[in-house]
């Protein structure tokens, strides 16, 4: 199974947060599972750090490199098909551009999105894994 980690799931997984549920943690740790993250999430983390809303265990650039290695993550490129899909998603879906891009990428590339975001979990047009279960 291929998983696209939502921004908060990436943070929780690397920082060892107990918010990440047992079922999700097990699913992501299966050796054959592919774990992907988007540069959109890096942008969101950078915004949170810049606003002082979160503190990371090291500077952001180092954090990204360390987490990619430790969690065996791959980057999913932001492609034209996903960008188009972000604004042609089956409705209803909310207007957050980052969520739209993540959901679109998951749909276009056949990924399951690991998230605790209730708006994404309740959206019936993308495969998801509840991050807090």
Model-derived segments and spans:
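Active-site neighborhoods of divalent-metal-dependent phosphate/nucleic-acid chemistry enzymes
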Residues: 55-61, 69-118
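Short secondary-structure boundary/hinge segments and terminal tails
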Residues: 46, 66, 85-86, 123-125
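Generic structural signal for small/hydrophobic residues in well-ordered secondary structure
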Residues: 6-7, 45, 86, 106
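Short, well-structured N-terminal submotif of metal-dependent ribonuclease cores
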Residues: 1-38, 51-66, 109, 118-119, ...
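Short acidic, glycine/proline-rich loop/turn micro-motifs
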Residues: 48-50, 88-89
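Basic, glycine-rich
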Residues: 128-130
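Hydrophobic side chains within alpha-helical segments
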Residues: 9, 47, 99-103
């Amino acid at each position: 199974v291929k998983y696209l980690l939502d921004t908060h799931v990436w943070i929780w997984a690397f920082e060892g947060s107990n918010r990440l549920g047992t079922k999700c943690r097990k699913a992501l740790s299966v050796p054959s599972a592919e774990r992907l993250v988007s540069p959109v999430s890096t942008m969101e983390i950078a915004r949170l750090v810049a606003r002082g809303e979160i503190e990371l265990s090291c500077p952001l650039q180092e954090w990204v490199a360390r987490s990619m290695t430790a969690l065996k993550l791959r980057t999913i490129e932001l492609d034209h098909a996903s960008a188009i899909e972000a604004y042609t998603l089956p409705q209803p879906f909310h207007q957050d551009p980052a969520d739209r891009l993540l959901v679109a990428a998951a749909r276009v590339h056949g990924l399951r999105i690991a998230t605790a975001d209730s708006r994404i979990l309740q959206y019936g047009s993308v495969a998801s894994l509840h991050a807090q279960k």
